[in-house]
Each structure stands twice: as structure tokens, then as C-alpha cells.
Design a protein with these regions (language model features):
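Short hydrophobic clusters on alpha-helical segments that form packing/core surfaces
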Residues: 23-31, 77, 106, 172
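Short, basic, alpha-helical segments at the C-terminal edge of helix-turn-helix-like DNA-binding modules
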Residues: 41, 71-78
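C-terminal peripheral helix-coil segments that are non-catalytic and often amphipathic
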Residues: 1-7, 142-151, 165-239
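Helix-turn-helix
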Residues: 22, 26, 30-64, 68
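Amphipathic alpha-helical packing segments from all-alpha helical-bundle domains
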Residues: 75-82, 97, 104, 108-112, ...
Length: 239
């Protein structure tokens, strides 16, 4: 059974809040620079210039500190996702322009946050609480991705637009996280160092955008929209 997240109440005094933010900033920087393998509370003390007692007075364990880092980072990610949604929704436009824009914006989101996402995703593979929070973020992100593309549902040529958009999200997410080496140690993913070149990353995102656009805008053989409607009606009737 996955235990619920148990984080202490936020500090009420300004001085205490500043100290907590200092701990979180130092711990996040250490995690980004050294990864989880070299992450210890002793090193957080050295990085922040605070005592181990100051840390334990605010976080009961290393796990709680890491979960709080993830919580704050997900808040930042959620904010960035909503900025993307507002930006693209305001532009309106057609599916032809929206599809590549959505792929590019969400790809850049993960690239922007890769240095902290990488260790946090690796830790989440071992921590069920962090894994659960990560899945919740993925679900929210997928919903926004779907919202932006399904606004142009009538322009999607696939007989099942919802399924097509879901497939696009899974492909984009899997491709981007693989290329950026998210959820793995930096020396495990052979492709990750390549994206340090802006040109290679740009080409990758352009190609990924083109693949998604072509998939959504091209006619698909097989079951027709009419056949799909009839099939769905039969399924609902059989429930």
C-alpha cells in the first residue's frame, strides 16, 4: 500500500521560512549537480551552511526532504504547463499550426526542467509516494495536451481523434524523456549528451512535430468514422 505524503506544516515565521527555502534550494542544487547517488543530508548541510539539527527540525528524514523538493518542482511544472495552455489557446489558429506548436512547447518544458527531473524521476522509481505524485502530474499534463489538440477535433483525420491524441502524447512523452535521459543516471543514456547541441535538439523536435502533425492530418485506412460510431454504439448498448 502506498503511504500518503506526510510533510510538516509550513513554517510560520519569516526567519524559519527563509531557512527552509535555503535548505530546499541547496538540496535541489545538490541533487541536480550530483544526482541521488551522492545526495546526503551531510552534503546538504555543507551546501547550505546549516547544521543537521536545522534540517531535522524541518524535515523528519531524507525521504521527506526529497518529497518536498518534488512537490515544489511539480508546482513549478504545473505553472509552466498552464502558461503553455494560455499561450497556445490565445493563438487559436488551426490544427496545422497548433499540432507542431504543442509538441515543441511540451518538449521544451521537459528540456527546461531536465536537470532536476532526471534525478527525481529516478528516485520515484524506488519511492511509491513520489511515483504516485509523478503520475498525477503526468495525468494533468496529458489532459492539457489533449485539450489543446482536441479543440481542433474536426481537423483530425484519424477515425478516433481522442485515441489519436492520446497516442501522440505517449509518443512525445516517451521520445523526449528517452532522448533527455530522464529517470536514469546520466551515464546510462547514450543519447542524452547529444541534446546538449542546440542544433541536434532542434532537429529532433522538428522531426517529432512533423511526425505528430502528419499522423493527425493524414487520412487513415481501415475503420471509417461511420463504422467507429456504430461500433461504439454497439459497445455502449452491450454494457
Amino acid at each position: 500500500m502506498v503511504r500518503s505524503r506526510t510533510i510538516k506544516r509550513p513554517p510560520q515565521q519569516d526567519r524559519s521560512r527563509v531557512t527552509q527555502e535555503r535548505i530546499l534550494a541547496s538540496a535541489s542544487a545538490l541533487l541536480e549537480q550530483r544526482g541521488y547517488a551522492e545526495f546526503t543530508l551531510q552534503k546538504v548541510c555543507k551546501e547550505s551552511g546549516l547544521s543537521i539539527g536545522a534540517i531535522y527540525s524541518r524535515f523528519s528524514s531524507k525521504d521527506e526532504l526529497l518529497r518536498t523538493i518534488q512537490e515544489k518542482h511539480i508546482e513549478e511544472l504545473d505553472t509552466d504547463v498552464m502558461q503553455i495552455v494560455r499561450k497556445l489557446a490565445a493563438q487559436g489558429d488551426s490544427l496545422q499550426s497548433t499540432a507542431p506548436a504543442v509538441v515543441k512547447e511540451f518538449s521544451e518544458l521537459y528540456r527546461k526542467h531536465q536537470s532536476l527531473l532526471r534525478p527525481l524521476m529516478a528516485i520515484a522509481a524506488m519511492d511509491p509516494v513520489m511515483a504516485q505524485e509523478g503520475k498525477k502530474f503526468d495525468t494533468r499534463t496529458k489532459q492539457q495536451f489533449r485539450h489543446l489538440l482536441l479543440r481542433h477535433k474536426n481537423g483530425i483525420k484519424h477515425p478516433n481523434p481522442e485515441r489519436a491524441v492520446d497516442n501522440c502524447f505517449e509518443v512525445v512523452f516517451a521520445s523526449v524523456t528517452h532522448v533527455l535521459g530522464l529517470g536514469t543516471a546520466p551515464n546510462v543514456m547514450g543519447t542524452a549528451p547529444n541534446v546538449r547541441s542546440k542544433g541536434i535538439w532542434r532537429d529532433f523536435v522538428e522531426d517529432l512535430s512533423q511526425m505528430v502533425s502528419t499522423y493527425l492530418l493524414s487520412e487513415h485506412s481501415g475503420i471509417s468514422k461511420g463504422e467507429l460510431v456504430a461500433l461504439n454504439a454497439e459497445r455502449r448498448a452491450g454494457r
